[in-house]
């Protein structure tokens, strides 16, 4: 398996972990996907157009999203991907749509997960950091072509 294929499997597992009908998520898979020191960062703009960021560790993210996932069907579906590898580091831009059903043709939102990876001593790729932002007026997804 190539590095790109292995990283692709990590990305697929990350989306599978957060996607599903309303109800709890299986966070036990987090340690296979994310490095123990990983950070996840949600970004956006406030009502005045000022940028904000929320930085979370693994436990912070699962706690932060618990109520949302308990009350909402949520499927994050990848619609594009670009991976670059250099030695034991890699990055990916993963374009996504957030949907209420996997086959929903009218997504609630679209955005980019910018993901950084590290290949550890065990040879496995894991996410070290992931930062994301959503489309909004004046900000459209790029063509990764």
Role assignments for model-derived ranges:
Residues 36, 79, 111-113:
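Residues that flank catalytic or metal-binding motifs in active/ligand-binding sites
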Residues 91, 110-141:
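Short beta-strand edge/turn micro-motifs at domain boundaries
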Residues 61-63, 109-112, 142-145:
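Non-catalytic cap/lid and distal C-terminal segments of serine-dependent acyl enzymes
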Residues 1-36, 145:
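Short, low-complexity N-terminal intrinsically disordered segments enriched in polar/charged residues
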